[in-house]
UniProtKB/Swiss-Prot annotation:
It comes from the Bacteria. This is Ribonuclease P protein component. Belongs to the RnpA family. GO terms for biological process: tRNA 5'-leader removal.
């Protein structure tokens, strides 16, 4: 049975981890959200989130976006390539309801899988 946990090893924790992704990212995005990815040598995917107060004013909205993004990643972690991902929330993401945000994330995860297979 596949474990769908979200342990510490699946998170980008230090600024160096984020910088690694920002240096040479593969991008997949919508007007409200961008997912940057870069292959890692760990054999499993990791995720980091950036939801700026400038783009999403209310804390409960930022928390909702982060919670839904983590859940989407947790459920897809075994299908994703071994990459470090940084999810960047843009202006207007707070206007998406939970279903729309989940669908957008699913679409972007699939796009990243295709990008890796294509290269």
């Amino acid at each position: 049975m596949v474990k769908l946990a979200f342990p510490r090893e699946l998170r980008l924790l230090t600024p160096a981890h984020f910088t690694f992704v920002f240096q040479q990212p593969q991008r997949a995005g919508t007007p409200q959200i961008t997912i940057l990815g870069r292959l890692n040598s760990l054999g499993h995917p990791r995720i980091g989130l950036t939801v700026a107060k400038k783009n999403v004013k209310r804390a409960h909205e930022r928390n909702r976006i982060k919670r839904l993004t983590r859940e989407s990643f947790r459920l897809r972690q075994h299908e994703l390539p071994p990459m470090d991902f940084v999810v960047v929330a843009k202006r207007g993401i707070a206007d998406l309801d939970n279903r729309e945000l989940s669908e957008a994330l699913e679409k972007l995860w699939r796009r990243h899988c295709r990008l890796v297979r294509g290269s």
